Structure formats: C-alpha cells, structure tokens
Design a protein with these regions (language model features):
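Conserved anion-binding
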Residues: 1-61, 65-66
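Charged helix-capping and loop-helix junction motifs
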Residues: 41-45, 71-80
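Cysteine-cluster motifs in flexible loop/terminal segments that predominantly coordinate metals
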Residues: 143-158
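Catalytic cores of alpha/beta
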Residues: 1-4, 76-113
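Glycine/Thr-rich phosphate-binding loops of Rossmann-like dinucleotide-binding domains
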Residues: 25, 69, 123
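Hydrophobic faces of well-ordered beta-strands that scaffold small-molecule active sites
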Residues: 15-19, 59-61, 89-93, 111-115
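C-terminal helical cap(s) of enzyme catalytic domains, especially alpha/beta-barrels
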Residues: 3-10, 102-144
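Glycine- and other small-residue-rich loops at beta-strand/loop junctions that grip anionic moieties
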Residues: 40, 62, 67-70, 90-94, ...
Length: 158
C-alpha cells in the first residue's frame, strides 16, 4: 500500500524499492530484511511482480549471497527479474572486476549496476569503471575520460 501511495503522491519515476534476496534452492529466492538476517518467507520473484504492479518505478535488487564476495552478480536472478517486470532494475551485490559490471547489463539485462567492494578493496575507481563499460559498448552519461588521463580508447581530446 505504501508503494502505491508514494507513487501516486511523488510519481512512479521517483520510487525505488530495494529488495534483499537470498537463494534458498534451485531458482528459488526469498526476500530478507534486517540487513539479510531475517527471512520473510516471501518468494522474491512473486514479490518483484507485486512491487512493480504497486507502482514502483525502479527496483534495487541485492543478492545477499553475492554481496561483498567480489565473485560477480547472480546473473540468473537478475535475468529472471528483468524478464518479468517492465521497470528498471539496478543490479547489486558481487562485483569484483570491471567485467562483472558489464555482465550485469549485457547478460543480466539490468538497467543499471551498483558496486562497492571493487572500489574499496582494489585499485579500480568509478572513473575506470565508466571507461571500461563505455569501451564494452554500454552507453553511459557523464564519462569524461580525457580529463582523467584514461587512454583506454581513442579520444578526440587526448
């Protein structure tokens, strides 16, 4: 109910619903709360449909199993969610390489990707990530590689 009321008041595009999901079996996922410590017993894929139908404008989808591991996104989960809803899905949880960011979009079909550990525990930066994704053919806003000395690909200003 709160999602629909918020969507009606502020507009669907302004409502992002965050879902923390844990894999509990083959292609079975459950919604968790309290930073991934408390099971709700709710089927995550059914909940995603409910959220989308209730007026959510975007979904921030976090795989609890992958979060902090740096082993890559749960691409099966992301793909299942993106295939069942017509709203943007932001993939979160598991990025350890720049390639993982690209995979979240190119394989998972996410509209956007989120990451943290890669930037805290490696020499990668958001600037390098944007440049890498652009080289991979992902259209990004705001990349200004020529200002940061990144010569990953030909630049008209370099």
């Amino acid at each position: 109910k709160i999602i629909q009321e918020s969507s009606d008041k502020f507009g669907r595009a302004n409502i992002v619903v965050s879902i923390d999901v844990k894999k509990i079996g083959d292609n079975k996922y459950e919604v968790y709360t309290h930073s991934g410590h408390q099971s709700t017993g709710i089927n995550a894929l059914e909940w995603v449909k409910t959220i989308a139908a209730s007026g959510a404008g975007e979904i921030l989808l976090t795989s609890i199993d992958r979060e902090g591991t740096m082993n890559g996104y749960d691409l099966d989960l992301i793909r299942q969610v993106t295939d069942m809803v017509n709203i943007p899905v932001i993939a979160n949880g598991g990025v350890g390489t720049l390639k993982h960011l690209v995979e979240g979009i190119s394989i998972g079909n996410a509209s956007a990707v989120a990451a943290a550990s890669i930037f805290h525990f490696t020499d990668q930066s958001p600037i390098k990530a944007k440049a890498y994704m652009k080289v991979a053919g992902i259209d990004l806003r705001g990349i200004r590689k020529h200002l940061f000395g990144l010569h990953i690909f030909p630049c008209q200003h370099c």
